[in-house]
Amino acid sequence: MNVIGVVGLPASGKGEFSKIAEGLGIPVVVMGDVIRNAVKKAGLPPTDENLGAMANRLRAERGMDAIAILCVDAVKEQKARLVLIDGIRGDAEVRVFREHFPGFRLIAIETSFEKRLSRLCERKRSDDVGSAEGLLTRDKRELGWGLGNALQLADIRLNNDGSLEEFTARVTDLIHSMEREP
């Protein structure tokens, strides 16, 4: 089994990458689901503030790699040649996946601040921030988890400042090439 991970700042296109992969039949393990489930169990609404606080709590109580460790079994349960992990936020998580999955490769999605802000304002998800200040705050929080270090560890970089069609073509080509690998 080949395992790849996707990393990027908020609204860079990680979720879109995952949708494209799923459309190609690639199983996706979403790290954020661990956090969303913990927020739900706590009886809280899935706002950006609650999700961020829960992620901070899990990392404070169990270590910066806690969420990755909770996802390892879900990845191992997949019966596919290629599996995607969505939502990597730090270098500690990258280390966990490289330890458990030889040949693990990390894909960084790179997108300008302006494009990311525009996307956040358009998609209106419950955990989205709708202002430049809110996005800067979210970026700072995630960079504090080691996201900048994780981005530096990327094996592959994909720019996502263009159209959805351009990004879809790049992701599709990349996934098809990875599916052909032993």
Curated annotation (Swiss-Prot):
One MF term in the entry's GO annotations: ATP binding
Source organism superkingdom: Archaea
Pfam families reported for this sequence: AAA_17
InterPro entries for the chain: NTP_hydrolase-rel, P-loop_NTPase
Keywords: ATP-binding, Nucleotide-binding
Positions bound to ATP: G8, L9, P10, A11, S12, G13, K14, G15
HAMAP family xref list: UPF0200
The family this protein is said to belong to: Belongs to the UPF0200 family.
Name assigned to this protein: UPF0200 protein Mboo_1593
Organism from which the protein derives: Methanoregula boonei (strain DSM 21154 / JCM 14090 / 6A8)
